Amino acid sequence: MTDIYEKLRARLDDLANGYPATESKVEIRLLKRLFTEEEAELYLQLSPFLEKPQDVAKRLNREVEELSAMLERMAQKGHLFRKRNGDQVRYSAVPYVVGIFEHQLGRMDEGFARDHEEYFETAFGQTIQSFKTPVLRTIPVNRQMVADYPVAPFEDVLQIIENQKKIAVAPCVCRTTKKLVGHECDKPVENCFSFGSHAEYYVENGMGRFITIDEAK
């Protein structure tokens, strides 16, 4: 019988950026740090598209109240993304990167950081290069194409920020991880922005704080 964590690894490998296996099984160690077996079982049945707990419960033939509590717990642990709209809440499964790993801010310890660094250096960092279908590839169309992609000036970035209703800033998860394994750098750490519902998620999970438009500038 296939181990639940092997099934979870395979599921994550089907999502964005993959989650490849290694001989050392460091990827399984990471999953055991992140998920209980019960959480892994539920994650396997969730969609990467936002769903209401009532819809998930109906699809899985489970009690709404019990399932809602588990979905919320998994969102707090960074397994799922949570989006609120008034009294309505929806959840979706997220990949390891970008997703579960970034959501470990405030939760990761040295052991997790060392396992992640080992995994990134030996396998995960090579996933894009190992895809059977290249991420970037040339497709001949036998006709001239006009490319007009201007580089956005600084003023455009300011305009994007000014148009946001909710902005959060959080520590850089990469620099946080490096610090835990003894490779702290001298660059600022609190410099990652999130906007809208993602800003709400970061603040609600204790990973970041809301800032004003002027502070973001």
Model-assigned labels for residue ranges:
Residues 1-28:
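Long, low-complexity, charged/polar intrinsically disordered regions in eukaryotic proteins
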Residues 48-60:
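Short acidic, hydrophobic short linear motifs in intrinsically disordered regions
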Residues 33-39:
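Short helix-coil-helix linker/hinge
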Residues 60-76:
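Short amphipathic alpha-helical interaction segments
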Residues 75-86:
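A short, conserved structural fragment
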Residues 125-217:
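Catalytic cores of enzyme domains
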Residues 43-44:
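Hydrophobic residues on short alpha-helical segments
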